[in-house]
Amino acid sequence: MFITEDIRYIGVNDHKIDLFEGQYAVPNGMAYNSYAILDDKIAIMDTVDRNFTHEWLDNVAAACGERKPDYLVVQHMEPDHSANVVAFMDVYPNAMIVSSAKAFAMMRNFFGTDFEDRAIVVAEGDRLELGHHTLSFVSAPMVHWPEVIVTYDSADKVLFSADGFGKFGALDIEEEWACEARRYYFGIVCLRAARISTLSSRP
């Protein structure tokens, strides 16, 4: 699925899950979102839940074709975003991981390595040039964990928002979007409402 001419959706749908984070009923499943930005350099945005490693890696390979990704941007360290960082780096050892300093510290605890020799640490205002696309990074602590960054693609005017603007439900199910987005907001990020409001009002 192409989001724009250069941005491809490579996430997966989970129809086996019944409780998200062990407490929120998700009768229509969940989607774990990941994207490929196809430019002079290829950036992969986030990974997916560990139960979908092979499907996701197949999606990455299909999106990249004969090429290999140059960057993996890890915006959030919750497992539904980061569980396949190690698997990705095993397949693409020449790729660089782009993430916040706090996220790399968490990787050492989660995975036993912080990928020091393949790490690009980014902070508020940093940019990554892919060619036509420039990614700008915005610090978004506590949306939903303290290490979170979100990423803005100025070429296509697309915000990759981590947990900030999510919803419950798999993407291959027809349902009322607003209802599940509202339920997700109040269940997952409502306690950080001020930070979400600040994030959405950024220029």
Predicted regions and their residues:
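Conserved beta-strand hairpin/beta-sheet module of binuclear metal-dependent hydrolase folds
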Residues: F2-C64, V150-D153, K157-S161
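Metallo-beta-lactamase
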Residues: F2-E5, S99-P203
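Active-site metal-binding motif and surrounding structural segment of the metallo-beta-lactamase
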Residues: D40, N51-V98
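Short catalytic-loop micro-motif centered on adjacent basic/acidic residues
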Residues: A43-D46, D70-V74, S136-F137
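Active-site environment of divalent metal-dependent phosphoester hydrolases
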Residues: M77-S82, F104-M106, H144-W145, G166-G169
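Short acidic, glycine/serine/threonine-rich loops at helix termini
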Residues: A87, N109-G112, A170-E174
